[in-house]
Amino acid sequence: GNCKCDDEGPNVRTAPLTGYVDLGYCNEGWDKCASYYSPIAECCRKKK
């Protein structure tokens, strides 16, 4: 699904970043967002 980064989240490289939920490594209770357009742009957001 679509995902938008939280500015205050960890690992924010490009925020707010719109992309997809990636099963990467974020802290428990967070989702990892990965950009559609940039493979190196990623961040974590609090699970809704």
From Swiss-Prot:
GO terms of molecular function: sodium channel regulator activity; toxin activity
InterPro entries attached to this UniProt entry: Anenome_toxin (IPR000693), Myo_ane_neurotoxin_sf (IPR023355)
Keyword entries, A-Z: Disulfide bond, Ion channel impairing toxin, Nematocyst, Neurotoxin, Secreted, Toxin, Voltage-gated sodium channel impairing toxin
Disulfides per UniProt: C3-C43, C5-C33, C26-C44
UniProt superkingdom: Eukaryota
GO CC terms of this entry: extracellular region; nematocyst
GO aspect biological process, one term: regulation of signal transduction
Subcellular location, record wording: Secreted; Nematocyst
Family: Belongs to the sea anemone sodium channel inhibitory toxin family. Type II subfamily.
Misc: A synonymy between H.magnifica and R.crispa is controversial.
Role summary: Binds to site 3 of voltage-gated sodium channels and inhibits the inactivation process.
Name assigned to this protein: Delta-stichotoxin-Hcr1c
Organism: Radianthus crispa (Leathery sea anemone)
